[in-house]
């Protein structure tokens, strides 16, 4: 049975999930966290390494000659040098689609927090705002309906499609920026360009993977062409935006709000520009982390391992 080492298990399973489906397939060693300086020592005898955010570089791969398989406990696998892994005969598998519903739900939660101001009014009422009112309904800033409002989605993978489905229920006008043919998009979703999305939408929501080509594509130039007061939502990757440009657009009012579950550096430094910018709604990378979604990750990783050991690897990204 293979020697299996999980390098950073804590965020996936702080104690509420069972490792049994993985442990039954090999000798499993689980570390809650692994500093980069200890990766090689801890994985030296491993044939299978499981990781979430621990980085595996070509240099590290060269020092792990027994390694045959890397299981990424996530959909995104940019923490692994997959080209170097392939060149060294190491298979890399990810976990696709485990969190489609969870992330789509969180996207709507962030969006509705901005438009419906739930947190804002809850805080005002804790301060006695409503109790002092002479009227049954009291508001100082109106909430917004999404019916007829243009919401543009950048990327139409599983999550983007699910968000589109939810928005259509609320009768929003949903547009998509995607390389896919318009005929393949969900009913009622129209394909537009990136410039058109930022210039004509009330809300833009990011749902694309991070690549070197689109890193920080939401930059000062794009934001200068955006509709005044645009609401930007990001549950994809923090590095898709230029932090300084977005912070400055929030300061100037060019952006009306930025609601995100991801930042370019996680955890962020205390002086991260997004954290102190006005009209930001930041959650600490929790969209994926429902108990149901985390349980699916463990199950699919176990299925990936079983398939690999049977000689028919699945969900291969290398």
Pin down the residues of each PLM region.
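N-terminal Rossmann-fold NAD(P) dinucleotide-binding loop
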Residues: 160-161
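Phosphate-binding beta-alpha-beta segment of Rossmann-like dinucleotide-binding domains, i.e.
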Residues: 88, 96-150, 169, 317
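Rossmann-like adenosine-cofactor binding region
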Residues: 56-61, 173-175, 180-273
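Rossmann-like dinucleotide-binding domain for NAD(H)/NADP(H)
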Residues: 92-93, 229-318
């Amino acid at each position: 049975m293979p020697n299996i080492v999980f390098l950073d298990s804590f965020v996936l399973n702080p104690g509420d999930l069972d490792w049994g489906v993985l442990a039954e397939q090999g000798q499993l060693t689980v570390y809650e966290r692994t500093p980069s300086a200890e990766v090689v020592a801890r994985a030296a005898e491993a044939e299978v390494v499981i990781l979430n955010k621990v980085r595996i570089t070509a240099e590290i791969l060269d020092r792990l000659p027994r390694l045959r398989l890397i299981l990424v406990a996530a959909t995104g696998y940019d923490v692994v040098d997959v080209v170097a892994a392939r060149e060294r005969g190491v298979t890399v598998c990810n976990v696709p689609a485990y969190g489609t519903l969870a992330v789509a739900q969180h996207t709507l939660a962030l969006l509705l927090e901005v438009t419906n101001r739930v947190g804002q009014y809850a805080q005002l009422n804790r301060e006695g705002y409503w109790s002092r009112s002479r009227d049954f309904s009291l508001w100082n800033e109106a909430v917004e309906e999404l019916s007829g409002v243009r919401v543009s989605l950048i990327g139409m993978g599983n999550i983007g499609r699910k968000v589109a489905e939810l928005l259509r229920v609320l009768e929003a006008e949903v547009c998509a920026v995607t390389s896919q043919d318009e005929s393949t998009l969900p009913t009622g979703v129209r394909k537009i360009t990136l410039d058109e999305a930022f210039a004509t939408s009330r809300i833009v929501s990011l749902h694309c993977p991070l690549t070197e080509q689109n890193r920080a594509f939401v930059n000062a130039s794009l934001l200068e062409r955006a509709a005044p007061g645009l609401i930007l939502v990001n549950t994809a990757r923090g590095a898709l935006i230029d932090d300084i440009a977005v912070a400055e657009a929030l300061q100037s009012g060019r952006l009306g709000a930025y609601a995100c579950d991801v930042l370019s550096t996680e955890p962020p430094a205390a002086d991260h520009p997004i954290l102190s910018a006005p009209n930001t709604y930041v959650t600490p990378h929790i969209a994926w982390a429902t108990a149901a979604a985390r349980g699916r990750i463990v199950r699919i990783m176990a299925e990936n391992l079983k398939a690999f050991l049977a000689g028919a690897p699945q969900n291969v990204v290398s």
